[in-house]
């Protein structure tokens, strides 16, 4: 059984027991989080496709940790003008373990 959920402006395919990184959520470590924006659920009977969401479907997970991704470097410059700007960025994320998919 798997589901496709929407969180943080992204769509993720999840199964029970999966560990996924989502955009930062304002919850504590160990807290339960519920994703109710479920776009598709696959069961033994077949696919349930939402238009746009599957009614009554929920995906429950537990927050494992909050973290920050690897640093990326943004470097802008203009040729022959001595204009250079270097900036780093680390995107915050929340790591979630998927516990249950309900329909």
Curated annotation (Swiss-Prot):
Keywords: Ribonucleoprotein, Ribosomal protein, RNA-binding, rRNA-binding. GO terms for molecular function: rRNA binding; structural constituent of ribosome. GO terms for cellular component: cytoplasm; ribonucleoprotein complex; ribosome. Pfam families: Ribosomal_L21p. The keyword Ribonucleoprotein applies. InterPro entries: bL21-like, bL21-like_sf, Ribosomal_bL21, Ribosomal_bL21_CS. It comes from the Bacteria. GO terms for biological process: translation. This protein binds to 23S rRNA in the presence of protein L20. Part of the 50S ribosomal subunit. Contacts protein L20. Belongs to the bacterial ribosomal protein bL21 family. HAMAP family: Ribosomal_bL21. This is Large ribosomal subunit protein bL21. It comes from Desulforudis audaxviator (strain MP104C).
């Amino acid at each position: 059984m798997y589901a496709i959920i929407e969180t943080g402006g992204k769509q993720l395919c999840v199964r029970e027991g999966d560990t996924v990184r989502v955009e930062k959520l304002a919850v504590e470590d160990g807290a339960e989080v519920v994703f109710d924006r479920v776009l598709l659920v696959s069961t033994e009977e077949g696919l349930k496709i939402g238009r746009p969401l599957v009614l009554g479907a929920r995906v429950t997970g537990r927050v494992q940790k909050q973290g920050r991704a690897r640093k990326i470097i943004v470097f802008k410059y203009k040729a022959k003008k001595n204009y250079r700007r270097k900036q780093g960025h680390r995107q915050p994320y929340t790591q979630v373990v998927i516990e249950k998919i309900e329909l």
